[in-house]
Amino acid sequence: MVKYPTGSVMPLRAAQRQGKKALLKKASFSDRGMTLEQQINESNQYYLDAGIAVVHKKPTPIQIVKVDYPKRSRAVIREAYFRQASTTDYNGVYQGYYLDFEAKETRNKTSFPLKNFHEHQILHLEQCLDQEGICFALIGFMTLERYFVTPASFLIQAWQNWKAAGKSSMTLAEIEANSFEIKSGFCPALPYLEAVDRIIADRKQEHGNK
């Protein structure tokens, strides 16, 4: 029997059947084709459930415009707008390392437009790198079904080249040469921590395995 916090119970067989249904539902959802954000969120949940890492999507800030108070103890938001996020999409902790990254997708097949990033995001990644954080962009070429973990150091350099010389995109070849490609799967949907392991290994090698 499975006992819930409310005190209700469910026979173990029924609970197992329910778990199988949830698994099948998740599998069919994956087959339909998820957005990059959905794949990352599902991966983060897998990492959390498995005790591997704690990574969450940062909430989008909201500007509240109008609030009604039908009761003195209760407020009802009548009008609100999403504001532009001030930093990046995701952050968390993995094996004692702080992770901070932005997720971007494109339908392009040969390049990724740098205009998809905002200047404040690049600045934030740069600041986190200065504090020894593991920072990157998770880029999805959705038409090609290819995914890359691009270290922030290369992204920052590409951004600076755009501002200085007008080169407004990263070619697929450049991303291939300066990123870690990951393959989509089932559990997790996007195993981006495999690339993070390689970033950590490279950093240790640069610092003499300290």
UniProtKB/Swiss-Prot annotation:
GO terms for biological process: chromosome segregation; DNA recombination; DNA repair. Keywords: Cytoplasm, DNA damage, DNA recombination, DNA repair, Endonuclease, Hydrolase, Magnesium, Metal-binding, Nuclease. Binds 1 Mg(2+) ion per subunit. It comes from Lactobacillus delbrueckii subsp. bulgaricus (strain ATCC 11842 / DSM 20081 / BCRC 10696 / JCM 1002 / NBRC 13953 / NCIMB 11778 / NCTC 12712 / WDCM 00102 / Lb 14). Coiled coil: none annotated. This is Holliday junction resolvase RecU. InterPro entries: Resolv_RecU, Restrct_endonuc-II-like, tRNA_endonuc-like_dom_sf. Mg(2+) binds at T87, D89, E102, Q121. The keyword Transport does not apply.
